[in-house]
Amino acid sequence: MYKRQTPGCGSVSEVGFAQEAGCDLCKIFPGDVLGAKLVKGLLAPMPWSKLMVTGGVEPTQENLTSWIKAGVFCVGMGSKLFPKDKVAAEDWTYVTEKCKEALGYIAEARK
C-alpha cells in the first residue's frame, strides 16, 4: 500500500530524501520542464524507485509513450485530459473517450 504523501521531486537527492522519509511514490514535477531524460537519469542509480510524472503530461501517444518508455510508474494529468470547456459543458463522452484513448496508449507503451 502506498503512503499518502507524494512529494514533488526534481533530482536524485530529492527522490532519495523522500524515500528515506518513507515515501513509496515520488512525483516528478514539472514534467514538461524536466523531461523524460530526467526520469531515466533518476532511475539509473535508483531502479527501485516508483515515479509519477505530472505537469504538462499530455494524453497523446507520443507524450505518454515517452514517459512510459523512460520508466515512470504512472502519470498524472489534469487540464490536458479534462479540458475546462468540456467539463463546463458536461461533455462526459469526450472525457471518457479521451481517458480510454490515453489508457490504450499507456497499455501499448508497456508491451
Segment roles from a protein language model:
Residues 1-2:
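Short, small-residue-biased leader/transition segments that mark boundaries at the very start
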